[in-house]
Amino acid sequence: MRIEWACWLFGYFVSSVGSERSLSYRYHLESNSSANVVCNGNISVFVNGTLGVRYNITVGISSSLLIGHLTIQTLESWFTPWVQNKSYSKQPLSTTETLYNIDSENIHRVSQYFHTRWIKSLQENHTCDLTNSTPTYTYQANVNNTNYLTLTSSGWQDRLNYTAINSTHFNLTESNITSIHKYLNTTCIERLRNYTLEPVYTTAVPQNVTPEHAITTLYTTPPNAITIKDTTQSHTVQTPSFNDTHNVTEHTLNISYVLSQKTNNTTSPWVYAIPMGATATIGAGLYIGKHFTPVKFVYEVWRGQ
């Protein structure tokens, strides 16, 4: 049975080339209910009613393996494991083609759509155990009642220890571990208490800046605290303040954090959290617990003056 989803988002704004431009997105996916869980679709970006960029993508599990590649770079940390087609087609805004850098700021909406609408096609089971001094969790992905992947991790390691039931069914790369971590964190975070965020951050301007890229000012002076949203409740953590104006294709800041506890209970696990904010997506390297192990996540800050 063919299932079609379509979703429109209007009234979103981005500061590009010194002016405010109204954006709308159209997401469309087609899913066949078959042994191969694959969705073909497109992402279209409209600026003031004019088609700005369209990406044609294929997301899903092919007949042989669950692909670990991406359509475009800015999508990598969101749903790398589920993007099958690395190529894409882009329709620029003719003479104002530079406006396509809006994708890097708003791509979170695209990924959220795929996560909420399509990824439910997979049966996902993940458990979290924080009773010991180091967190232990298990992640298992099933497709059509077949174990495609089982992951078990004890503590925060450079790489997850994993067992693929059939190694040909899952192409596990270090980059797509990010998405798995994100899922696991959603399950675990509701059980976390009494932690504080210590900003120990550095910033790096993206390279390969060329004149053709639009100048976008990223006003990143967030409030004193932002709220972490999870399945059951909200937590508040402190965020750093910084200002950056780049002539770049992507707004990327490499930020390192150390998350520690408010309590003096040394037997409790060191934990982490993913603050979810507003429009600007920033790549962050989080250093977890006493191991200081780098794990890639996406960190969002509030945008505006």
UniProtKB/Swiss-Prot annotation:
Main location: host cell
Signal peptide span: 1-19
Protein name in the entry: Membrane glycoprotein UL142
Lineage: Viruses, Duplodnaviria, Heunggongvirae, Peploviricota, Herviviricetes
The keyword Transmembrane helix belongs to this UniProt entry's keyword annotation: yes
SUPFAM superfamilies hit by this protein: MHC antigen-recognition domain (SSF54452)
Protein's membrane topology: Single-pass membrane protein
Segments traversing the membrane: 271-288
Assembly behavior: Interacts with host MICA and ULBP3.
Cytoplasmic side: 289-305
One GO CC annotation: membrane
Function field: Participates in the inhibition of the host immune response. Prevents host NK cell-mediated lysis of the infected cell by preventing the KLRK1 ligand 3/ULBP3 trafficking to the cell surface. Also retains another KLRK1 ligand, MHC class I-related chain A/MICA, in the Golgi apparatus to avoid its surface expression.
Species: Human cytomegalovirus (strain Merlin)
